[in-house]
Amino acid sequence: MKKDNSRVSQIEPNDLNHDRLDSQDYYWRFWANVPIYPYSKRRTIRREVLPNTIWTFDQLQGIFYVVVPIRMTIIRLETVGLLVYAPVAPTRQCIALVRELVEQYGEVKYIILPTISGLEHKYFVGPFARKFPNATVYVAPNQWSFPVDLPLSWLGFPAKRTKVLPEDSKQVPFSDEFDYTILGDIDLKLGQFEEVAFLHRRSQTLLVADSIVSIPKQPPEIIEQDRFPLLFHARDSAREPIKDTLENRIKGWKRICLFSMYFRSSVLNVPSIGKILTDAWRSPDKSSRAYWGLFPFDWQANWESAFDKLSQNGRPLVAPILQALILNRAPLETLEWADTIAGWKFNKIIPCHFTPLIHATPKEFRQAFDFLESSSHRSLPEEDLETLRNIDALLYKPGIVPPPKAENLRLKDK
């Protein structure tokens, strides 16, 4: 089989915004099922992580211009064929990029859905699998859907080709190349949380879905392809014009990270309704794209220090939302899962969001879960977690979700 190692030509960045993407190559027909930005228009960037072995495919997604990367990883099998971890939207462009790999390395043999709760991962799998009719789909156990729990076949998964990942990773046909371990399911009453981490032994690469991220100081390449969200959030007031500068892109990205990680950090205030409306009236851009001039954000002067405390130079991090709302419901199970992974041999992590490649050791991976055991200098500031703590209390005090257990674990350690 001929191997062409040439890079796929990438698209040049558009001026500002996805509204200018008219090509059918980027069209995602099922966008209304999960109507989040960029809706029906999704670019894909393919990057070769390890020559002839590992590739990432980045798209973007978000709400109210709080946009982050979402990532699929493809690994070449030692024999012939490809394994796909966490598919993204199978646009014409995306599938063309995948088929270039198929021509060189063989067909897509396995498609992995590593989560049960992430709609942004789940709803791509069925349409993606239909593009590769010989692939077997493996899903994390205990799949569910909301508001009605439907069979996977009703959600577009190919019934005859979809299997559940067994607890024992030796029972799958790719066990000679991969290990995996399953976290969960963590009962949240409203649903469950589960994640399957994969280890590609030959390349010493760990694949995770949502559990670990690394926050970069500059916007990832796929985010730079659509600059308007960056520039929208870079402003300090609705009265400011939207200006495309490198400084503004970085500024907007850092604020987007604070939004996506904390919802509302301690350095963000909400102006009065009167001020919001007055500023909107005086905004130089009252278009629908700019939300008619509405900009309900008032960043404090020290906002950038909050980003630095969050990023900590790109160290592996468990997202604050998982820390405050999910993993603290099952601290012992989470730590056992993290301990299992820390016993594996790897030197890099590919997550489904934010930084595409994290150079990290098993010890550094395990340290990211220290928040479940004790407070330390690595912990995130409590003042920035306050909004998430308040949401948590609103949910568990009436019994909507189970109460957190991590605090009890810390007290027991003392």
Task: Report residues per predicted region.
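Active-site HxH/HxHxD metal-binding segment of metal-dependent hydrolases
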Residues: 101-174
